[in-house]
Curated annotation (Swiss-Prot):
Keywords: Golgi apparatus
Record family assignment: Belongs to the GARIN family.
Biased segments, Polar residues type: 240-257
Gene Ontology cellular-component terms listed: Golgi apparatus
S-S pairs: none
InterPro entries: GARIL-like_Rab2B-bd
Function, in words: RAB2B effector protein required for accurate acrosome formation and normal male fertility.
Gene this chain is encoded by: Garin1a
Source species of the chain: Mus musculus (Mouse)
Protein name as catalogued: Golgi-associated RAB2 interactor protein 1A
Inactivation phenotype: Mutant male fertility is significantly impaired compared with that of the controls. Spermatozoa from mutant mice showed abnormal head shapes with an abnormal acrosome morphology.
Pfam family, one: GARIL_Rab2_bd
Length: 297
């Protein structure tokens, strides 16, 4: 009886990304391997390219085709957009007895890991399916999509370039993850969660949260001083009333005003991302709102 070899331990239907060769490819396997163990929880979108140069007509940059794998991923899975660019070189070992039909497995060498904010991606030639990649060191690559990829893959890259240039109208909504560039921590108005925020490291709190926390402490101090002053004033008024029994004058004591809206209301939504314009949250910048809440009307 013949034996079937090479079956994986678990067989599952591959997704459309796997069939197109853009998900779970060689680059993804490399960075998720124990050797690197990078971005293990993030999906890698990758494609194979040929490095080319332009001398009248597009041609391979080297005598032997320079094959590269270009991919993007996210340093944190919850990010709405990728923020990491990956580049790897692909080579095939050529032994003295190797032929075109007996080539060994390709060798993948990770060459660059760059933040996408330091990289410029551009669709340079749509008909030839060529990308232009410029790094922060002014190194420019012209990469032609490998012929094994269908046209749909290049459409994915066109869409990716447009999204990276214009952005998306969404942000991550996970309150457990602190991103100073896209989130204001969502905290409730209960005093029990104030200690939780103060226990967070300073690097995870943004400037707005720190400013509001300091303002809240100052507001509590001012309110406590006002209450003490009012208590002593009431005691003094009661003593004067008992001493002077002949006078019938009525006096109205002054009451210290305090803002009814808690300072934590500003942290329920981002100052630049109001989900409902009818909600009674701070609409003015933090600097102008703090003065009203601290000093009262």
């Amino acid at each position: 009886m013949s034996k079937i070899r090479g079956l994986p331990p678990a067989i599952r239907d591959p997704g459309p990304g796997v069939e197109l060769g853009v998900v779970d490819g060689l680059l993804c396997q490399l960075i998720h391997s124990p050797e690197f163990n990078l971005f293990s929880d993030s999906v890698v979108f990758e494609s194979t390219f040929i490095q080319v140069t332009k001398q009248g007509n597009w041609m391979d940059a080297y005598e032997r085709s320079a094959t590269m794998i270009l991919g993007v991923t996210s340093s944190v899975p919850s990010l709405p957009l990728p923020n990491i660019l990956l580049m790897a070189n692909v080579t095939w070992p050529h032994g003295p007895f190797s032929t075109c039909s007996t080539l060994g497995a390709p060798v993948i060498t990770l060459s660059r890991i760059l933040p996408l904010k330091y990289v410029e991606l551009q669709i340079y030639d749509r008909t030839q399916r060529i990308l232009r990649v410029r790094t922060v060191t002014e190194k420019i690559y012209y990469l032609r999509l490998h012929e094994k990829h269908p046209q749909a893959v290049f459409q994915f890259w066109i869409r990716l370039v447009k999204i990276l240039q214009k952005g998306l109208s969404i942000t991550t909504k996970d309150p457990r993850i602190q991103f100073t560039h896209c989130l204001v921590p969502k905290m409730s108005n209960s005093s029990t969660e104030t200690a939780t925020e103060s226990s967070l490291p300073a690097s995870s709190q943004n400037s707005e949260a720190i400013m509001l926390l300091a303002a809240e402490r100052n507001s509590s101090s001012l309110l406590e001083l006002s209450n003490r002053h009012q208590t002593s004033r009431d005691r003094h008024t009661d003593t004067a009333t008992e001493t002077d029994n002949s006078g019938n004058c009525k006096s109205t004591p002054l009451v210290a005003s305090s803002a009814s809206m808690p300072m934590r209301a500003a942290l329920t939504h981002s100052l630049w991302e109001q989900e409902d314009s009818n909600e009674n949250f701070l609409q003015a910048p933090v600097a102008s709102s703090l003065g009203e809440n601290l000093l009262g009307p």
